[in-house]
Regions:
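Enzyme catalytic cores with a strong preference for nitrogen-chemistry domains
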Residues: 1-352, 370-379, 411
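ATP/NTP-dependent adenylation/nucleotidyl-transfer catalytic domains that generate, transfer
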Residues: 7, 18, 159, 216-218, ...
Length: 642
């Protein structure tokens, strides 16, 4: 099973300018290498059969004939292979010369795509030799003894995907041919290029491809010539780049003196989901009305067992590397701006937050502090309420008080023990029975206290629940589930930890920083069950519902990508192979789907709160799901996993 992945390659072969036999042999070698690695489609650079830098030699009949002989050699010697190859070469026909891409498979030429936009400025002189596709009316060409379709509107259909082709400068045009190809169904776009180097040009190139890939919601394979091309005036670095929907997933080593084959997998299943979700894509297809494409069928590619080369981030919600600081600041600013608008609009006099000494309430408090500072309001109008109960430990209690005091907010302490004891008497519940009644009564008592204090102080209760908890329904209905504005509702648990740590290290004095770092290291717990005999947390959330890093991984690929359970399991096993065994992953995947469906009723009445990332489960925004939807199909697929 390939799970919707199509294995593609960008090849940068060694080249000798105007030596077609040598170039054909190098191309053959890389096709054979790619076939052995399960590649389904491989692209080569622009004019790779002759070399791009032949100059006025393109006017020589010998070069053109040898180029076709080189193509015949490649076609013949790869006729037993399943792989589809896209080669660049000059093609002479009816008194003109075309800079073209030729698609071959199993001993046949499938089609020819000529270049549309010929650069004729600065170091480029292509119009000196070549004719643009727009000036050619023919729709077929004789090549290698075959008459094959020709045009810029060819779409090549395989059993797994549809792809289209453009050549180098085509991408730089205001409306590239690939835009039309994508609107007509191309899911993967190939660009055969001869892109020379210049200071800063590579970053611009990556930005350009990223934008086109994202705009077309497509895979984009860019392949440019490298070592061996003439360096009379310019240098070619051998750029092989593979993008998917705006993200770079594979790249070549620039300035290599050897041939390279860069391989990765395009997730066409995900691209199809994105195109369905982003309705402007189909709307553009209707409004722009591109002409009807010519569809070319390919032979069935023998699907080998998928050997996925792509790596997947175990923490897809968490920014990495140089992006970390910028993204954390951006996320924090979204939360702050959302809360500020709500406070100003309601003319609230205070913000009331329940502080447990855990991660979520800590982040909510930090958002409140930053919001009040930015509005120029006194921190004393932030009322932090610690409400110790039967399961509160010294560690979390101390951290809650230390944090509130170091931040200079108003601190209130209201124990819930006596109120809960009385409540248990009122409803005739045995206090020694630590069941759901015992736990939820405490959560609802805390919410009642916060709501009443907010009424006392003309304030708003700020919700602390995060995206991961809400996805799993790990919240007491009308308890911690409820607030007047929830700032964390779109922030997953794995990201909460990074945000708190980021604030600690970038925006806090030493006392606050040390407290925050200890909170980050504290086991996640609702602390509704009494501590153990040593005073340590007994009720650890991740022992009960599973590791949050797994659930956040499941959540991302379920909601963001629309993947089915078997595909999520496949990716999770690969990604966490050194952390969890398959049975553990399957167990928690089953828990995830069971709880996600069963707990939708809590998400159907969530308080308002700002969307932060690409995923939100607000019933008014991103996620509108009936509370009584059946989970049977999803759970059945999980159960069937080997």
């Amino acid at each position: 099973m390939n799970y919707g992945y199509v294995k593609v390659a960008a090849a940068v072969p060694r080249v000798k300018v105007a030596d077609c036999k040598f170039n054909a042999r190098e191309i053959e070698k890389e096709i054979i290498i790619a076939e052995g690695k399960g590649v389904q489609i491989i692209a080569f650079p622009e004019l790779c059969v002759t070399g791009y830098t032949c100059g006025d030699l393109f006017a020589q009949q010998l070069l053109l004939e040898e180029a076709e002989m080189g193509l015949i050699q490649i076609v013949s010697n790869t006729r037993q292979l399943d792989i589809i190859a896209i080669l660049g070469m000059p093609i002479a026909m009816n008194g003109v010369l075309l800079n073209a891409a030729v698609v071959i498979q199993k001993g046949k030429v499938l089609g020819v795509v000529p270049k549309t936009y010929l650069p004729n400025y600065k170091e480029f002189y292509e119009k000196r030799w070549f004719t643009s596709a727009v000036d050619v009316s023919e729709r077929s060409v004789r090549l290698c003894g075959q008459v094959v379709p020709m045009g810029t509107d060819l779409l090549f259909e395989t059993a797994d995907t549809t792809f289209g082709i453009e050549i180098c400068e085509d991408l730089w045009a205001p409306i590239p041919p690939s835009s039309s190809l994508a609107l007509q169904g191309a899911e993967i776009l190939f660009n055969l290029s001869a892109d020379n180097e210049g200071i800063g040009k590579h970053n611009y190139l990556c930005s350009l491809i990223s934008q086109q890939s994202a705009r077309c919601i497509a895979g984009y394979v860019f392949c440019s010539c490298g070592f061996g091309e003439s360096t009379t005036d310019v240098v070619f670095a051998g750029n092989g780049l593979i993008f998917e929907n705006g993200s770079l997933i594979a790249r070549s080593k620039r300035f290599s003196f050897e041939g390279q084959v860069i391989i990765s997998e395009i997730d066409v299943e995900h691209l199809r989901t994105e195109r369905r979700d982003i309705t402007t894509f189909s709307a553009c297809r209707a409004h722009c009305a591109p002409g009807e494409a010519v569809r070319v069928s390919t032979e069935y590619v023998n699907s080998k067992e998928l050997n996925l080369t792509r790596c997947f981030d175990p923490h897809p919600f968490v920014p990495q590397g140089v992006e970390l600081n910028e993204r954390c600041e951006e996320i924090f600013s979204i939360q702050v701006s959302g809360l500020a608008q709500r406070l100003v609009h309601t003319a609230a006099k205070s913000a009331v937050v329940g502080i447990s000494g855990g991660l979520d309430s800590t982040l909510a408090l930090l958002v409140c502090v930053k919001t009040f500072d930015k509005l120029g309001w006194s921190r004393k109008d932030i009322i932090g309420v610690t409400m110790p109960g039967f399961g509160t430990t010294d560690r979390t209690y101390t951290n809650a008080l230390d944090l509130m005091n170091s931040l200079g907010i108003t601190v209130r302490e209201v124990s819930i023990k006596e109120a809960c004891i009385q409540h248990f008497k009122d409803i005739d519940h045995d206090i020694d029975v630590h069941d759901v009644v015992y736990e939820n009564a405490q959560a609802r008592e805390r919410t009642q206290i916060l709501m009443d204090i907010a009424n006392q102080t003309w304030g708003m209760v700020i919700g602390t629940g995060d995206l991961s908890e809400l996805a799993l329904g790990w919240a007491t209905y009308n308890g911690d589930h409820m607030s007047m504005y929830g700032v964390n509702g779109s922030v997953p648990k794995t990201l909460v930890k990074y945000l708190v740590k980021w604030v600690a290290e970038n925006d806090m004095d030493e006392a606050s920083r040390m407290t925050l770092l200890d909170i980050v290291d504290t086991p996640i717990s609702p602390e509704l069950i009494p501590a153990d005999e040593n005073g340590n947390i007994k009720q650890i959330t991740e022992d009960l519902v599973g590791p949050y890093e797994l659930h956040d991984f499941f959540l991302y690929y379920f909601l963001r990508c629309g993947f089915r359970p078997s595909k999520i399991f496949f990716l999770a096993v690969r990604t966490f192979k050194d952390v969890y065994d398959e049975e553990t992953i399957k167990k928690w995947l089953q828990t995830f789907f069971r709880r996600f469906f069963n707990q939708q009723f809590k998400r159907s009445c969530l308080p308002d709160g700002p969307k932060v990332g690409s995923i939100s489960i607000s019933p008014r925004g991103d996620w509108r799901m009936p509370s009584d939807a059946s989970s049977e199909m999803w759970l059945r697929e999980v159960e069937s996993l080997a």
